Amino acid sequence: YTYTHELGIQGMQKNLGLSDEQIVRKNNVDDTDALATQKAIQECIDEGCNIIFGTSWGYMDVMEQMAEEYPDIYFCHGTGYKSNGKNFTNYFGRIYQARYLSGIVAGMNTKTNKIGYVAAQDSSNSEVTGGIDAFAMGIASVNPDAEVYVKITHSWYAPEAEKAASLQLLDMGCDVMAQHCDTPYPQTTAQDAGVYGIGYNSDMRKETPDACLCSVIWNWSAYYTSEVQSIIDGTYDGKNYYGGMAEGLVDITDLADFCADGTQ
């Protein structure tokens, strides 16, 4: 997840011709620690930043408060739902579109009709549940006999829990492994077991060339470029952003050569 946002910032920087000195990064800021979040944002402001992107859900409330305190600075929060229509907006994407397509791929390549899904959060998180629903709908459109089995880690980044969840799903007979979590363990575990995987966030063929049927991917540079450009040229309108495949924000990778005949 963080890696794809970093690629997005790099893409924006290249597209707009910005120098390295114009980009300030604050990494590993605990989104459950409001003081740490506030400190990181304040440091950005003190270093002269006038556009601040926060990529984690937990930054939302602090960004909302600081947007009120600094009305001349643009605050853009990823994955959240709060905004003020002025200098505080939220952004995300129609990832369900790509999830649906990846479900079609999974449904056409399972032999056991059992498909595993390692999820970072439970049903209280609409981002995760919406992705599962879209994935399941894609599966059902081509293989109504297949079922999706979900294991929850209760953390966006929990390597050991993700590995354990993957092994549990394999023990249940799942032969395609999808995920909404931050490590490649569901994919590497699938490859080690000789079954297929559906990657997420970035192209996971790099880690699992023998298992990855396709990956659901983000191209965050599509958003970062358009948002920063709008501020530069004066067309910024304070609206929230919710792009999809049409905007080039979400997609799936090319299909693996070993996908079942007819997968398209």
Positions of PLM-derived features:
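A residue-level marker of the well-folded mature domains of exported/periplasmic proteins
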Residues: Y1-Q264
